[in-house]
Amino acid sequence: MRFSRLYAPTLREDPSDAEIPSQALLQRAGFIRKIAAGVYTYLPLARRTLLKIENIVREEMDKIGAQEILMPIIQPAELWQRSGRWDDYGPEMMKLKDRHNRDFTLGPTHEELVTELIRNELNSYKQLPVSLYQITTKFRDEIRPRFGVLRAREFIMKDAYSFHDSWESLDETYQLFKDAYSKIMERIGLRYSVIEAATGAIGGNESHEFVAFANTGESNVLYCDCGYAGSDERVPYKGDYEKDDEAEKTLEKVYTPNVRTVEQVAEFLNVPIRKIVKSLVFKGRDGFVMALVPGDRELNFEKLKAYLGDQSLQMAEAEEILEEFGVPIGFLGPVGADKVRIVADYGIKYMKNFVVGGMEKDYHYLNVNLDRDFKVNEWTDLVVVQIGDPCPVCGKPLKGEKGIELGHIFKLGTKYSDSMDVKYMDKDGKMKSFIMGCYGWGISRTLGAIVEQLHDDDGIIWPRSVAPYEVDIVVVGKEKEKEFSEKLYSYLLDKGVDVIIDDRNVSPGVKFKDADLIGFPIRITVGRKLKEGKVEIKERGKEAILVDANMEQILNAINEM
């Protein structure tokens, strides 16, 4: 490719809406352009990198025997209604009606469709196991699309699905995908971790995430020297609960004008934050639920959804709370809340004389005690585990790092085959539900994650495996330099090197800045050193070296880098 013909409009300033490095750099370097919130056009440089990412993923899928298909993006509502997820999936599902008033969705995932696909095709245990995958566009109506391609409404994803006649067979295939995903990370060149994760809206009973480390990541990875690693959405709390042994005090209802947050309540009443109980109200398919957690801990929404078995669960709106309870947010509490289902974290069992909302505007209860003042019948682990909490395996303090989820694999079991009544005949002639697994990888998200992990003040630092072009020939000089550069360009093309030549009529400074901004892994400068029989070769982010202006030696130097 000639830079003079390349469509890669670069920008000298960060876009005003860019929140993180990848969002800024991918736009500045001419990889993407924003069309609407969470919707992007991928320009030629981005397409080249995306195709290289896709090919790495495709090669690793093919190696483990997965077969590529392509399913439609638009899916009929009946499939999702049959599985029970039409209402459960939540507002992230983009729904639409056709001209005949039939309901459809722009697929956020394809479990229902692929299960329906094999209904009349896989009939016998002799045909199993089977793994199918696709690379396609998906849609999720994110409430706040942000961070560029890391959380977009429209994105490119690889999703795979496996069908089995036994859990042992699923375990084997699950491990194949787990190993393949690690190889994908390694081939791309990312620092990563494999962690235990929540199953979320997909369902199932076991899952793992593949997380690329990045300071701006939204995933919190907790890990231990013993080898344990997990998402903070999943890690169970195994710490000791601080037990209050003081005598019960008389319940008081205290006037607390305009005091709503835990911090405000603690300051106003002069009590430690740990002596406050947060009362959070959610709305799901079975109505309202009040969740109770100690004031010094955060509620783990994924744990609550998993406990309730309700992925449609959402935080109740202020208007809904006022209508249902007659109390504004900030003054809710369990005392007197007899008609709502209450689920509490284990830590509250050991608290005495604590503070809760007074179920009346501008009031809180002081010296509240369990059983005497209210009852809880449902107890579970509801808190977010933090850095320093005990490892659930060995008990040592957990460490933490932020990351970006790129891959997620699930053991689905019979969740979808049961709900959609899709069966096969086993070796005894009995009809049984397929045991399933599913395996997702964010292709376009990987584009952003690489930039988040690999960049500096000058621009992107692409690994050679996924760079849009591996080698950039920068022509600095007149006829002799141009003539040599053209010969070198043709030679490298013939040798299969992914090369671009910067033949633009612009200053050397502009060429060097664009090379660093775009992030070409290797830059060859053909300039004044050519008179001495040398060219300059520089790896991105490293010092330049001089190499003899000999085609074969230049190629050897490239291959050794």
Curated annotation (Swiss-Prot):
Keywords, ordered alphabetically: Aminoacyl-tRNA synthetase, ATP-binding, Cytoplasm, Ligase, Nucleotide-binding, Protein biosynthesis
An individual GO BP term: prolyl-tRNA aminoacylation
Disulfide bonds: none
Matching Pfam families: HGTP_anticodon (PF03129), tRNA-synt_2b (PF00587), tRNA_edit (PF04073)
E.C. designation(s): 6.1.1.15
Major place of residence: cytoplasm
GO molecular function: aminoacyl-tRNA deacylase activity; ATP binding; proline-tRNA ligase activity
SUPFAM superfamilies, alphabetized: Class II aaRS ABD-related, Class II aaRS and biotin synthetases, YbaK/ProRS associated domain
Record field: catalytic activity: tRNA(Pro) + L-proline + ATP = L-prolyl-tRNA(Pro) + AMP + diphosphate
Subunit description: Homodimer.
Comment field on protein domains: Consists of three domains: the N-terminal catalytic domain, the editing domain and the C-terminal anticodon-binding domain.
Biological role stated in the UniProt entry: Catalyzes the attachment of proline to tRNA(Pro) in a two-step reaction: proline is first activated by ATP to form Pro-AMP and then transferred to the acceptor end of tRNA(Pro). As ProRS can inadvertently accommodate and process non-cognate amino acids such as alanine and cysteine, to avoid such errors it has two additional distinct editing activities against alanine. One activity is designated as 'pretransfer' editing and involves the tRNA(Pro)-independent hydrolysis of activated Ala-AMP.
UniProt family annotation: Belongs to the class-II aminoacyl-tRNA synthetase family. ProS type 1 subfamily.
Protein name: Proline--tRNA ligase
